[in-house]
């Protein structure tokens, strides 16, 4: 019985790890990255609202970077629909 419980815990942790990722937050309205200048608090709040662990403003890219968020909440180069809009 104890082995089954341990197996279930480990399996659930693996599944949680597979469904989350790190990356730039996606503005679903524009298809662009969520932009910022130096406001880590804003990015962290937005990241947590989207079920991420921690977010910050990546200064060189002027975009909010989020760790541990679901992949559906993140911007991906392959599916970029921004076309230079803000």
UniProtKB/Swiss-Prot annotation:
Alphabetical keyword list: Antibiotic, Antimicrobial, Calcium-activated potassium channel impairing toxin, Disulfide bond, Ion channel impairing toxin, Neurotoxin, Potassium channel impairing toxin, Secreted, Signal, Toxin, Voltage-gated sodium channel impairing toxin
Function of the protein: Inhibits sodium channels (Nav). Also moderately inhibits human calcium-activated potassium channel KCa1.1/KCNMA1/BK (41.9% decrease at 2 uM toxin concentration). Shows moderate antimicrobial activity against both Gram-positive and -negative bacteria.
Protein name (record): MeuNaTxbeta-1
Subcellular location: Secreted
Tissue expression from the record: Expressed by the venom gland.
Keyword ATP-binding belongs to the record: no
Primary location: secreted
Site (Located on the interface between the toxin and the human BK channel): 48, 50-51
Biological process, per Gene Ontology: defense response to bacterium
UniProt domain comment: Has the structural arrangement of an alpha-helix connected to antiparallel beta-sheets by disulfide bonds (CS-alpha/beta).
Organism: Mesobuthus eupeus (Lesser Asian scorpion)
Gene3D superfamilies reported in the protein's UniProt record: Knottin, scorpion toxin-like
């Amino acid at each position: 019985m104890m082995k089954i419980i341990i197996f279930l815990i480990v399996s659930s942790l693996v599944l949680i790890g597979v469904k989350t990722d790190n990356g730039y937050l996606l503005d679903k309205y524009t298809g662009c990255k969520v932009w910022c200048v130096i406001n880590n608090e804003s990015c962290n709040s937005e990241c947590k609202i989207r079920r991420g662990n921690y977010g910050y403003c990546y200064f060189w890219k002027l975009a909010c970077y989020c760790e541990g968020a679901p992949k559906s909440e993140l911007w991906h180069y392959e599916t970029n629909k921004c076309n230079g809009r803000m």
